[in-house]
Amino acid sequence: MMNMKIVLFSLLLFVIRWNIISCNKNDKNQGVDMNVLNNYENLFKFVKCEYCNEHTYVKGKKAPSDPQCADIKEECKELLKEKQYTDSVTYLMDGFKSANNSANNGKKNNAEEMKNLVNFLQSHKKLIKALKKNIESIQNKKHLIYKNKSYNPLLLSCVKKMNMLKENVDYIQKNQNLFKELMNQKATYSFVNTKKKIISLKSQGHKKETSQNQNENNDNQKYQEVNDEDDVNDEEDTNDDEDTNDEEDTNDDEDTNDDEDTNDEEDTNDEEDHENNNATAYELGIVPVNDVLNVNMKNMITGNNFMDVVKNTLAQSGGLGSNDLINFLNQGKEIGENLLNITKMNLGDKNNLESFPLDELNMLKDNLINYEFILDNLKTSVLNKLKDLLLRLLYKAYVSYKKRKAQEKGLPEPTVTNEEYVEELKKGILDMGIKLLFSKVKSLLKKLKNKIFPKKKEDNQAVDTKSMEEPKVKAQPALRGVEPTEDSNIMNSINNVMDEIDFFEKELIENNNTPNVVPPTQSKKKNKNETVSGMDENFDNHPENYFKEEYYYDENDDMEVKVKKIGVTLKKFEPLKNGNVSETIKLIHLGNKDKKHIEAINNDIQIIKQELQAIYNELMNYTNGNKNIQQIFQQNILENDVLNQETEEEMEKQVEAITKQIEAEVDALAPKNKEEEEKEKEKEEKEKEEKEKEKEEKEKEEKEKEEKEKEEKEEEKKEKEEEQEEEEEEEIVPENLTTEESK
């Protein structure tokens, strides 16, 4: 039930922000009764019916799939038939246009006047941007324009825009009192008759021009003016609702980032405006908006920081941005004089363009840049003033609600100080903060379970819920497709935490403190067709609970004593396989002592954080440090207690720094590698030279051997020849001797 309430509440915010319903001007003349806006129950009933309405008036809304819608449709059958419902939804999405406001001769409240002023400033700013772009294009094509000044369409359009800007500046100078009145008006809620002023503001951009293509230019300008107003309305609703609708809105914006089922698609036409707004740190009262959004979990639940903003805003009485307005008017005089010097010509005669001073465009462009900067500051001041007005309107709605409740109960009308009213408002923020905390934890656990245990395609089909609740039969872990026991323990632990949160959430909503409350183990068997209660039905059904009943218990009490005091059977968590989880989550019924309640609730939050920390540690061990799960878990559960996540830009910077370091290291290693390569080459060359020397020595030795062998052979031959000669001589001598003897 609480989940759907939060979704419905966020739907209301989106309905107010987007301004996406287009209706006829004749229908707008009726408006919506202010009683709807000042009555929380009726307003919530409208949102409920619109949430479950199949033929919804909200463009782009998904078809409802909530099981509670069946009962809601039965309640809203008669309401859907009435024309008042369609008109109310239409005007709720059109910026709180009231019936009294539109029926009383065009009277406007202060917030509407401030919105019209912002629309005018936004169109004025867009005209300056268009003129700057036109001047840049002229400067880039100056050599062509010098040749053809008389019939150059770019130069002609520039002169037209300068004349339009001159008329706007003259109008602002003549109506200084109007601007000062809007900026310095106090946040009263009486309607002021400013019909002529608003008409003059809205019609200033539609003045006719005495030139050719007159009708075409007027049509284009009207179309641009309408788009500008739509963009600014979207921008205003976005910024104002996000910053003024107390901590519920802040937490809902955080929930929209957590839940996958919320509408993540923004209007593409508003991207430029949002980028410009994000670049400026708007302030709400005295405290910056960033301080409200970046508070820790404890301050978010107690609402201390936001209450400081409320008190500071209620204490303010003067206007905002008077210095910015003076600077804006003074700079506008200089722009007007500059434009007057440049545009002293009749646009009907194109030959006058020959005298157009192109050299003075640089000075004009510089003045436009300064003027645009001052215009942004003035727009910021107007937005701050508008936020203060809306915050006071929120406070006044709460006061009127308390008075009406007192009249219905027959009690005297409350007459207390503003501080006491703020404390009452703080109780509502405290209650809503706890409910939103439960919703955020549960949605996060669902996402974690889907991340760790993704469903197969076959499992995505519709499955009976009873079959899902039946315990799985544990098979052998070796079988294919069976989850290990560790996975089952983790999933069961997550499911148990979600069941506990569901149960405590229902207790906070219903405030059932009887001893017959169904424990969490049997809560799944309860009747699901319960009607959705209004935001303050607990107050009506059980007023004594809010003022008298208090249920506290001590840590040292036995379990039976705790059950008697709270009326709820506490269920133990199923312990994890490798971790110890604390035994119980405690439920404290909200009584009338704020300090004790805040301390008890903060203790419960710390216990929930410890439980989630244990689950987180177990999941990290199982997933081996999965970074994606770690980021999601840290951002949505641990808030500021866990390490802050690095943004994408920081990651890119780190990656660039790492790549630069790697490149530097590579560059540093490069000369070392070259020296090693040169040394290796020298070694190889030396080895080659040594091998060649060895070869040469071997060849020399072989040659020497061959020569020695040849010499030995020759010597042997010589010796043989000498021996032969000696033998021949010996043979010759005896023959001679014989001859002599014969004689």
From Swiss-Prot:
<feature type="repeat" description="6">
    <location>
        <begin position="256"/>
        <end position="261"/>
    </location>
</feature>
<keyword id="KW-0175">Coiled coil</keyword>
<feature type="repeat" description="1">
    <location>
        <begin position="226"/>
        <end position="231"/>
    </location>
</feature>
<keyword id="KW-1003">Cell membrane</keyword>
<feature type="compositionally biased region" description="Polar residues">
    <location>
        <begin position="211"/>
        <end position="224"/>
    </location>
</feature>
<feature type="compositionally biased region" description="Acidic residues">
    <location>
        <begin position="226"/>
        <end position="274"/>
    </location>
</feature>
<feature type="compositionally biased region" description="Low complexity">
    <location>
        <begin position="512"/>
        <end position="521"/>
    </location>
</feature>
<feature type="coiled-coil region">
    <location>
        <begin position="644"/>
        <end position="733"/>
    </location>
</feature>
<protein>
    <recommendedName>
        <fullName>Merozoite surface protein 9</fullName>
    </recommendedName>
</protein>
<feature type="repeat" description="3">
    <location>
        <begin position="238"/>
        <end position="243"/>
    </location>
</feature>
<keyword id="KW-0732">Signal</keyword>
<feature type="repeat" description="5">
    <location>
        <begin position="250"/>
        <end position="255"/>
    </location>
</feature>
<comment type="similarity">
    <text>Belongs to the plasmodium ABRA family.</text>
</comment>
<feature type="compositionally biased region" description="Acidic residues">
    <location>
        <begin position="722"/>
        <end position="733"/>
    </location>
</feature>
<feature type="repeat" description="2">
    <location>
        <begin position="232"/>
        <end position="237"/>
    </location>
</feature>
<keyword id="KW-0677">Repeat</keyword>
<comment type="function">
    <text>During the asexual blood stage, involved in the sialic acid-independent (SAID) merozoite invasion of host erythrocytes by binding to host SLC4A1/Band 3 protein on the surface of the host erythrocyte.</text>
</comment>
<feature type="compositionally biased region" description="Basic and acidic residues">
    <location>
        <begin position="459"/>
        <end position="473"/>
    </location>
</feature>
<feature type="region of interest" description="Disordered">
    <location>
        <begin position="202"/>
        <end position="282"/>
    </location>
</feature>
<feature type="region of interest" description="Disordered">
    <location>
        <begin position="666"/>
        <end position="743"/>
    </location>
</feature>
<feature type="region of interest" description="Interaction with MSP1 and host SLC4A1/Band 3">
    <location>
        <begin position="77"/>
        <end position="235"/>
    </location>
</feature>
<feature type="compositionally biased region" description="Basic and acidic residues">
    <location>
        <begin position="672"/>
        <end position="721"/>
    </location>
</feature>
<keyword id="KW-0461">Malaria</keyword>
<feature type="region of interest" description="Interaction with MSP1 and host SLC4A1/Band 3">
    <location>
        <begin position="364"/>
        <end position="528"/>
    </location>
</feature>
<dbReference type="GO" id="GO:0020003">
    <property type="term" value="C:symbiont-containing vacuole"/>
</dbReference>
<feature type="repeat" description="4">
    <location>
        <begin position="244"/>
        <end position="249"/>
    </location>
</feature>
<feature type="repeat" description="7">
    <location>
        <begin position="262"/>
        <end position="267"/>
    </location>
</feature>
<feature type="signal peptide">
    <location>
        <begin position="1"/>
        <end position="23"/>
    </location>
</feature>
<comment type="subunit">
    <text>Forms a complex composed of MSP1, MSP6, MSP7, MSP9 and MSP3; within the complex, MSP6 and MSP9 mediate the binding to the host erythrocyte. Interacts with MSP1 subunits p19 and p42; the interaction is direct. Interacts with host SLC4A1/Band 3 protein (via the 5ABC region). MSP1 subunits p19 or p42, and MSP9 form a co-ligand complex that interacts with host SLC4A1/Band 3 protein.</text>
</comment>
<dbReference type="GO" id="GO:0005886">
    <property type="term" value="C:plasma membrane"/>
</dbReference>
<feature type="region of interest" description="Disordered">
    <location>
        <begin position="512"/>
        <end position="540"/>
    </location>
</feature>
<keyword id="KW-0472">Membrane</keyword>
<keyword id="KW-0964">Secreted</keyword>
<feature type="region of interest" description="Disordered">
    <location>
        <begin position="459"/>
        <end position="487"/>
    </location>
</feature>
<dbReference type="GO" id="GO:0016020">
    <property type="term" value="C:membrane"/>
</dbReference>
<feature type="repeat" description="8">
    <location>
        <begin position="268"/>
        <end position="273"/>
    </location>
</feature>
<feature type="region of interest" description="8 X 6 AA tandem repeats of [VT]-N-D-[ED]-[ED]-D">
    <location>
        <begin position="226"/>
        <end position="273"/>
    </location>
</feature>
